Amino acid sequence: PASGAGHQFSHTWEMEGHGLDWEPPLSHGFKVGIGTIASCAIWEEFLAMEAEDFDVDRALAAVKTPEQVESEVRAALKPRMQDEAVRHSLKKRTEGEELVARIELLKEKWPELRERLRAQLMAPGEVMDRLKTVGAPYHPELIEIDWDRFRQTHFKAQMIRDRYTVLDILVDLGVYGDVVERLF
């Protein structure tokens, strides 16, 4: 229900080796469930924004150079994950007129787009309740992910794939760090 970003949380943990040595190994689906709660919370923050909040000047000021992107990826991720994540992160990186055009289009389409998204996305609490109902983990600590690591995964998950998700929209807007801080 959340644009693939939930899988990126799971993939991050799997690439780090989390739960792979358990008996039985930690289920991919359990990790995706926790990632889905996280991504639905991010979506909830995004959907609370107004078109006027999409500040082109702020977004342009927040654009990182390719060297900064590479440095951040390498600082955040394990060595075996770095090269591919650098390629993915640089592929998604947007700047200049392309970024301005993307934000202006988002501003123009936002009222209609936001209503369509609200109609199909679940609130994080609803996802938690459904996971509880079926006996699946519904909190990161239930899969041995502490709160600090969970927070860090919000940033790592954006780096590891080239698919464009809500995580990347918020990076493009220059507000992803603020959104994550509000969630924690």
Q: Where do the model's predicted regions map?
A:
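A conserved active-site cap/scaffold subdomain adjacent to cofactor or substrate pockets
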Residues: 1-48
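C-terminal charged capping/lid subdomain of soluble metabolic enzymes
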Residues: 49-184
